[in-house]
Structures are given as C-alpha cells and as structure tokens.
Amino acid sequence: MKDKEYQLLKSKFLKAVANVPIPLRDEIIAVVDNENISWRVAEAEIKKDAPKSKVILEQLKKIGVV
C-alpha cells in the first residue's frame, strides 16, 4: 500500500470510527495474525501507525468500511 493511499484510508477510518456508537466499539471488525481487532484496537493501532495498521485498513477496505 502506498503512503498516499494509506493516509486516505486512515482519514476515512478515523471519520468512520467517530460515528460508531460507543457500545459497538468493542465489536470485532478484523482479524490480524489470528488476533481479533475491535474498533477500539483498530483505532489505537491506526493512530500510532503501527505495523498492523496497514493490514487492518486493507481488510476494512475489502469489506467496504473505508
């Protein structure tokens, strides 16, 4: 994933997560390395540009979240 695409998907994700009701933020939205990723975990990983953030964003792009 190129940096420009990453930044665009990151921006879209942060806008989307802001609209997710708080009770739903513990729901699983992705699985990375056999680890369940909730909205909260995804937000933390993506905000700090962690290595898993690209994989998370790619999965969310595939399912139409971003």
Feature-to-residue mapping (PLM):
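N-terminal acidic leader/helix
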Residues: M1-V31
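Short acidic, hydrophobic short linear motifs in intrinsically disordered regions
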Residues: L24-K47
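Short, intrinsically disordered low-complexity segments
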Residues: D49-K52
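Short, hydrophobic-biased segments on the C-terminal half of alpha helices
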Residues: K54-E58
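A short, conserved structural fragment
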Residues: K61-V66
